[in-house]
Amino acid sequence: MGRDTIAEIITSIRNADMDRKRVVRIASTNITENIVQILLREGFIENVRKHREKNKYFLVLTLRHRRNRKRPYRNILNLKRISRPGLRIYSNYQRIPRILGGMGIVILSTSRGIMTDREARLEGIGGEILCYIW
């Protein structure tokens, strides 16, 4: 049985965010690098750096936490895996769902690479819905 690297990075980021950790380390692959670049561009994480350890590459992510008056930290990341190896979910560009009325993002794998729902609508292409982030 194969590994689902997208589910692994989503779970790692979600667990680190709930545990109020500032830094999380994930395995580096082409897919994870593209997803992390989208998270960085959309402002969900602060910083990314590539780290090499014994011929393996890792991405070290710095998570963004917001201060709240009542509680010291507020969890800002909600990530949900949609298409998985056992059940692939595809959508054309007209039926890509809007998360929280456009406040969240949908990450898609298209024929032109991994992109957000806004980019896919602008280019007029659909693809496999990887995850929701809000």
UniProtKB/Swiss-Prot annotation:
Subunit description: Part of the 30S ribosomal subunit.
Q: What does this protein do?
A: One of the primary rRNA binding proteins, it binds directly to 16S rRNA central domain where it helps coordinate assembly of the platform of the 30S subunit.
Q: Which GO terms describe its molecular function?
A: rRNA binding; structural constituent of ribosome
The biological process GO terms on file are: translation
The record's section on SUPFAM superfamilies has: Ribosomal protein S8 (SSF56047)
Q: Which Gene3D superfamilies match?
A: 3.30.1370.30, 3.30.1490.10
Would I find Calcium among this entry's keywords? Answer: no
The protein in question is named: Small ribosomal subunit protein uS8c
Q: Pfam families, alphabetically? A: Ribosomal_S8
Q: State its location(s).
A: Plastid, Chloroplast
Q: Does the keyword Thylakoid apply?
A: no
